[in-house]
Amino acid sequence: MAYRVLVWGLGAMGSGVARNVSQKEGLRLVGAVEKDPQKIGRDLGEYLGGEKTGRQIYSDVEKAVSETRPDIVVIATNSFVEEVLTKIETVARHHVDILTIAEEMAFPFFSHPEESEVLENIAWRYGVSILGTGINPGFVLDLLIIAMTGACLKVDRIEARRINDLSPFGRTVMRTQGVGTSPEEFKKGIETGEIVGHIGFQQSIAMIGNALGWDIDRIEESREPIISKTERRTSVAHVLPGMVAGCRHIGRGYCGDKLMIELIHPQQILPEKEGVDTGDYIDIFGEPDIHLSIKPEIPGGKGTIALATNMIPAVIEAGPGLLEMSELPIPRCLLNEIKEI
């Protein structure tokens, strides 16, 4: 048995998911959807750097779904709920399950209650499962923390830090992080909403709070530019000394006046250029205290690609509804033929 997978969006992450899916014994990549005229109509296998497969890159998702008959569509196009809601409904009308790496979809119930109700209704109307996931939100600063609290008798508060490298990501992430801007442009971008830093603090904090039964009634965020002292260059970004290399973003979740969850997430391209070591650090204060250090960081690009691939069977095998990671079977790497979870 092989699940049929259609990928919508062939940016850095979407292409990675498509390539990974094509290498899995229990998954079959049946096509992709793109808006870039230079990609449309090309052979998908050849575009991904392999041999011709006869599977094409479509411009029209309706035609793609009708012709390829996927079990699931992986949407890798946008970060925000409002941007993917219509796309999700378009796929759902074909009674096809959906997995998206849109960060706000990891746990939209707190930040977008009205849209979440709409999505829940769509899921039940068409009998489909909908899940948002990725490395973060979706794993490091939420699901992994939730799993670790399972070894605690009680939990008083949580602190976690993810110090990571943005280099593997594409232009959309660079833009939302302010990479390549001047300090003045960064400040203006924060004010206009063009620069948002990390997308997902509200989702991660709300997911943790929901899992632990904490009534998180307020989430506060702060953002500061990371000014580069060195020249840095990736395939999609070029930063000179004095320009912004990333964003130091902090999210805090409160129950009343009590700080329960603090997540710290400085993200920048090529942090090693200035001697910064990446890593993931989780501190759970309770009984007992638990402290986890992962060095270097779990790579953001590979981690997102892996989770978007590895969660496919769980989404297909789940019942209808708008799902979130903590209510599904724990992620595991797909190595061989898929067995029912």
What feature does the model see in each segment?
Residues E103-V128:
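Rossmann-fold NAD(P)-binding glycine/threonine-rich loop
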Residues W8, A12, G16, T68, ...:
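Conserved active-site and cofactor/substrate-binding residues in soluble primary-metabolism enzymes
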